[in-house]
Amino acid sequence: MKRERLMSINKEKAEAAIYQFLEAIGENPNREGLLDTPKRVAKMYAEMFLGLGKDPKEEFTAVFKEHHEDVVIVKDISFYSICEHHLVPFYGKAHIAYLPSDGRVTGLSKLARAVEVASKRPQLQERLTSQIADALVEALNPKGTLVMVEAEHMCMTMRGIKKPGSKTITTTARGLYKESRAERQEVISLMTKD
């Protein structure tokens, strides 16, 4: 799949745009250190945007019927994404909890794969959090879903306010975890426990 996505971008157009950008900032794209930069940057963005055109829900290919009716939590799923406002990285960890319905569970790696697909595109952290939750709800129809994303945004670290180390935390709850504050708080305490 990686090869398919890398080949699906318009490589010539991307390289030409990067070449023009280098000229626009006063650089000489033909100097030794920059000769292959347009090609390298186009290839890098193709890899960083592997999630474009994919639905995170499609990552839930393994669904099992088990006798498990209690919460399932996978935390500290590392990810990186690209802020769609400034095209610089934001990165951090996603924590996912769901309460199975009728014993329907998924492979744990599928949760990480859904995060990967949703994050590898120009993105907003708020949307990323919701897309992960929605994919899980559509795939498993759990009684409750809660997703928490913690990230550092380079657009706040490198430019503007310049506050390195600051983190943004977003949460999205569905089902029981949206309806019941007590249930939601219990899951959040498990997610944030070291």
UniProtKB/Swiss-Prot annotation:
Pathway: Cofactor biosynthesis; 7,8-dihydroneopterin triphosphate biosynthesis; 7,8-dihydroneopterin triphosphate from GTP: step 1/1. HAMAP family: FolE. One of its GO terms (cellular component) is cytoplasm. This is GTP cyclohydrolase 1. Belongs to the GTP cyclohydrolase I family. Keywords: GTP-binding, Hydrolase, Metal-binding, Nucleotide-binding, One-carbon metabolism, Zinc. Zn(2+) binds at residues 83, 86, 155. It comes from the Bacteria. It is an enzyme of class 3 (hydrolase). One of its GO terms (molecular function) is GTP cyclohydrolase I activity. GO terms for biological process: one-carbon metabolic process; tetrahydrobiopterin biosynthetic process; tetrahydrofolate biosynthetic process. NCBIfam families: folE, PRK09347.1-2, PRK09347.1-3. InterPro entries: GTP-CH-I_C/QueF, GTP-CH-I_N, GTP_CycHdrlase_I, GTP_CycHdrlase_I_CS, GTP_CycHdrlase_I_dom. Toroid-shaped homodecamer, composed of two pentamers of five dimers. Its EC number is 3.5.4.16. It catalyses: GTP + H2O = 7,8-dihydroneopterin 3'-triphosphate + formate + H(+).
